[in-house]
């Protein structure tokens, strides 16, 4: 089965019936399909119902059949892994921007071949998660941020005005997630300085970013 067929089977909104992220994921992940990868996803889904969610995790578990593959999920809400879920799925409760939890998670399961942020969609948490986790991506691995359209919605701490003018920050003085990743392209294309003119010094670290690709409502950062 294709990734999209598996996604439709499990009811995740990543399929072509909804966001159609599977069209982006398939060529990226197909070379890893039969390997013992470690995939970390932020966000179990299902909102506050403890027995709902996990559709994405089940999709990944079926798409990556290798017995050594691991699917790790971080979720803020209290959730229950269902009795018939694949035993290779592990669920951790915690906040995606909790450094202590992230450090513990990385120490146990890292490095990660694939990291997917499909959690809060709040710019501040999305940026912080990337700061904490990208260093734990395997060389050649990828870090995906889904639903980047949230950067343009006020209720997700976005700002149309800020995104239309990259020099203008949000009202709270911070960047939207799209502004952050747009600036990260400067790090990719202009290496050799510790701080770029348009790049906040607290984001200038020595983690080697190979590339950043922007798609409709989704971006992929690859590590060298």
Indicate where each model-derived feature is located:
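A short alpha-helical cap/connector motif
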Residues: 1-116, 120-145, 149-224
């Amino acid at each position: 089965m294709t990734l999209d067929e598996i996604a439709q089977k499990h009811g995740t909104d990543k399929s072509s019936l909804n966001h159609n992220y599977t069209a982006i994921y398939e060529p990226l992940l197909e070379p890893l399909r039969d390997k013992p990868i470690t995939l970390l996803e932020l966000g179990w889904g299902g909102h506050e119902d403890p027995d709902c969610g996990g559709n994405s995790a089940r999709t990944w578990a079926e798409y990556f059949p290798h017995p050594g593959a691991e699917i790790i999920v971080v979720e803020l809400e209290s959730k229950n892994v269902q009795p018939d879920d694949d035993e290779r799925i592990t669920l951790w409760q915690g906040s995606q921007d909790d450094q202590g939890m992230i450090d513990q998670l990385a120490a146990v399961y890292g490095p990660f071949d694939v990291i997917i942020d499909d959690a809060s969609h709040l710019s501040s948490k999305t940026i912080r998660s990337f700061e904490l986790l990208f260093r734990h991506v395997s060389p050649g691995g990828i870090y995906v941020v889904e639903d980047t359209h949230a950067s343009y919605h006020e209720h997700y701490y976005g700002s149309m005005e800020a995104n239309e003018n990259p020099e203008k920050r949000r009202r709270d003085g911070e960047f939207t997630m799209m502004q952050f990743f747009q600036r990260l392209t400067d790090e990719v294309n202009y290496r050799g300085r510790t701080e770029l003119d348009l790049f906040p010094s607290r984001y200038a670290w020595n983690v080697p970013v190979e590339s950043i690709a922007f798609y409709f409502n989704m971006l992929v950062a690859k590590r060298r």
